[in-house]
């Protein structure tokens, strides 16, 4: 088991991949440059506000609303960094980058909650996760789609494209394509991207398996924005054991480098298991993430769903406190501005509620059914049903069972 590796001391994790190390390096924007960019972003926000509303009183109200929204999630914490990739500036993994085509529409969509925006299009969703295949070569300890893995596919390629089209008609800032392992349906992935409206960003959620340089190039050319690659330990053997696949760690390194080499934004995703959590382990993981040159690291708390169903995997208060303290140190302390930005949903969900559950996001499973999120499997209907709007309303009214849906 993975616990057997916890006592292993590693000062530095050597890279084991045989391909050349990428020359790509995400630019961490800090210091004076950060202040200049933040000032320019404020100018963009004002421009969007003026586009959305004619009444100057609404301009003031909208600006105050955005300030409250920021404080709601960040509190008084001061941002010390953002990431610049391909000339676009990213403050988070789940918001379009400033200077990207979808940024202004994303902001207008948030303003729509302050007061309905009647000038221009707004998005119904910030993020939608869409599992496009049941196929997977791994058997991960925490897999939330465990009961469906490697069963017969239900949706045809045409139906998959129809689902993407229907969601985009509602308006969505980002669509995250997952599985199973989506890279096992490479031609389907490319076809989905080629046929999609480029108004949305598309991300790949993957173990990294089969993200070769050729596949990374094909996906970039088809319109993929970035890849979220799962890595559950900085020790290769521990990750391989957790994933029940002897080459799992190797493919993580390959995937990150190949994605970086093709100008895809990269993120690592860590399941913060009870066995893993310690300041030492978290820091060793971030050192490796920095070495691999990813822009973001996502912390996902384990949930008792899928392969973890009926297991004591939820973090206790002491473990949560360790992760939260570490998250704040890396993200909001100037001394760690060279490290990737951490995305930690649990931190905000405990304080502000869940924005998924059909409100700002949802999960579409491999049958085309809608669920509150990948970790909350409560189907309310199918995207392709004529009655989809009512299914969506039922999803939103049900909200999230783990956190309040504000």
What are these regions (language model features)?
Residues 187, 301, 374-375:
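Short clusters of small/polar residues that mark proteolytic maturation junctions
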Residues 369, 375-406:
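Membrane-interface junctions of multi-pass transporters
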Residues 54-91, 95-96, 100-214, 222:
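Conserved alpha-helical substructure of the radical SAM core
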Residues 2-52, 232, 237, 241-357, ...:
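Radical SAM enzyme [4Fe-4S]-AdoMet core and its adjacent flexible, acidic
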Residues 131-133, 176-178, 203-207, 228-230, ...:
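A cross-family glycoside hydrolase active-site/sugar-binding cleft signature
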Residues 135-145, 372-375, 402-405:
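Local cysteine-cluster metal-coordination motifs and their immediate loop/turn environment
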Residues 126, 171-174, 198-202, 223-225, ...:
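Short, well-ordered coil/turn segments that N-cap beta-strands
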């Amino acid at each position: 088991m993975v616990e057997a590796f916890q006592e292993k001391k590693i000062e530095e994790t050597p890279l084991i991949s045989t391909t050349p190390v990428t020359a790509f390096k995400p630019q961490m924007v800090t210091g004076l440059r950060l202040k200049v960019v933040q000032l320019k972003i404020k100018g963009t926000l004002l421009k969007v506000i003026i586009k959305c509303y004619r009444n100057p009183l609404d301009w003031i109200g909208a600006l105050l609303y955005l300030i409250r929204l920021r404080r709601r999630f960040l509190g008084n914490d001061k941002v010390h960094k953002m990431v610049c990739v391909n000339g676009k500036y990213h403050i988070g993994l789940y918001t379009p980058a400033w200077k990207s085509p979808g940024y202004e529409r994303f902001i207008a969509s948030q303003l729509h909650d302050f007061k309905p925006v009647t000038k221009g299009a707004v998005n119904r969703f910030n993020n939608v996760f869409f599992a496009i295949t049941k196929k997977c070569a791994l058997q991960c300890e925490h897999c939330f789609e465990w009961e469906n893995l490697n069963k017969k596919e239900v949706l045809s390629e045409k139906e998959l494209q129809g689902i993407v089209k229907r969601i985009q008609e509602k308006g969505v800032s980002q669509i995250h394509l997952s599985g199973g392992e989506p890279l096992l349906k490479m031609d389907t992935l490319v076809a989905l991207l080629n046929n999609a409206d480029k108004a949305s960003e598309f991300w790949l959620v993957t173990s990294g398996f089969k993200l070769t340089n050729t596949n990374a190039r094909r996906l970039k050319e088809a319109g993929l924005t970035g890849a979220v690659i799962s890595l559950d330990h900085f020790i290769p053997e521990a990750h391989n054991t957790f994933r029940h696949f002897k080459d799992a760690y190797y493919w993580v390194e390959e995937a990150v480098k190949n994605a970086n080499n093709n100008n895809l934004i990269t993120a690592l995703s860590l399941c913060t298991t009870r066995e893993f959590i310690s300041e030492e382990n978290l820091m060793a993981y971030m050192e490796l993430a920095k070495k691999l040159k990813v822009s973001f690291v996502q912390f996902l708390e384990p949930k008792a769903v899928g392969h973890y169903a009926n297991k004591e995997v939820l973090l206790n208060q002491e473990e949560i406190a360790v992760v939260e303290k570490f998250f704040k140190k890396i993200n909001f302390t100037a001394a760690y501005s060279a490290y990737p930005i951490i995305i930690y949903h649990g931190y905000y969900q405990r304080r502000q509620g869940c924005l998924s559950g059909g409100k700002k996001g949802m999960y579409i499973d491999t049958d085309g059914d809608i669920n509150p999120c990948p970790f909350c499997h409560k189907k309310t209907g199918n995207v392709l049903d004529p009655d989809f709007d009512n299914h969506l309303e039922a999803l939103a009214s049900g909200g999230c069972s783990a956190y309040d849906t504000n």
